[in-house]
């Protein structure tokens, strides 16, 4: 069994974004036609008791408060969180680590590049590596996600590189092949994928999606020039390291023949019209078989 | 006039703290006998329209959502926030800066030590200094808080050093005299103080409090060995850089003759019994003339 909780479904900045009065953000703020969403993160478990967090969003403190499965019970201090797996070093994927201070043991996993970005920022020393060991992920190799008591969780993780870009604050250092990851998690029977950022859908990614049972995929933008056309930013989706949902080469097109998995869009930017519940774009993606992720959604892959 | 909104009233970790099942945190989580609080921050304004944020807590995104006065209206992007003033470089005072990314101009003010700590962490480069200028505070000198349009806000800020300690993640670098600040803000008529962390109450601090109209003071712990006795941490209040509310040399005792100001405890740790609404300690501090800060509380100092 794999249980999944969507802790947050929005891209960096969240929905609404702090400084935005664009129509989507106003709708989310006033709860009229669009639901607010915190920044993207998943909780994953094989037993419904011990959880692994995929990306530590800046909203993690609030996400834990809103998610009873992640509340500690019993002794004075503790957590059902066994580990955190990072797909990249972007602010919206790592800032929540600063919430997980307070000398609480868990395992922190990420690529060499991402762990190096943490090491380059002394503030993350608040998570003492003696208490929160930092474990580099070996790409394309299945590793058992271990509970804190040393017993295998029942989940196997395979991290793989996907086209992306360096974190905004580290762009000057240039691009590294392991800077953006996809994660494949299996209980040996069913498989889920988490690919919240992806600049290009390769044939390898299509193969992985076709074989999976549940896929959370980069839903940042509807179209590549969306931010530019809306007057929100000079940056294209490609410049930000994201393929766009409805463009040629995007997930709707590329995964159209992948009929096995449940397909979910996550890491959705506040400019994306699929966030409006009644928009034509929302109807389009739903008609194409996609679910638009919301905070608090749960998914279960049952072992037959 | 000075308007103040308490954006958050809790110490680092917030209330409840993510990994705590101590009685206070359970009470806050279940809303039985104690109100939840986000991490300490104030918003201050001379006109109720343009605001300055004192400390950028990790909860700042949620705090802005919960505070209509801080919502931008009108154009696509913007903010009523004119500037952010930091009292120290602790995680609970600076992490919220990462929420204020998105190329939105405002002024960032802090001591040389605190600005150096930001510079030592490239992640804060997400706030491009070309867009968010970093202005070192000159201690003990009144400076006009300027709105973004270059017009004085009507508020004068004086920052002064108080006994404290280096941020947790920078303790190895040793202590610096300007690492912990108190802030005095006046409209030329009324004066408020913000001293969320203070390891020792000096005669200078007593003089400032006696002359002020509104004081927000370090309410981290009730007694110095509170965390140790509760089995929560091996650290004393002194080790964490905080004088304790009810100890000899604490604010209740030292400011007992300061009858002019309204006195408010802020930056309250989740172990502090004053967070229980019906506790004897809560009654004690209220009887001594103190208010225990809550998120969303507002204060106004009127100019006669």
Swiss-Prot record, chains A, B:
Keywords: PQQ biosynthesis, Transport. GO terms for biological process: pyrroloquinoline quinone biosynthetic process. Pathway: Cofactor biosynthesis; pyrroloquinoline quinone biosynthesis. The keyword Endoplasmic reticulum does not apply. The keyword Transport applies. SUPFAM superfamilies: Metallo-hydrolase/oxidoreductase. NCBIfam families: PQQ_syn_pqqB. May be involved in the transport of PQQ or its precursor to the periplasm. Belongs to the PqqB family. This is Coenzyme PQQ synthesis protein B. It comes from Gluconobacter oxydans (strain 621H). The gene is pqqB.
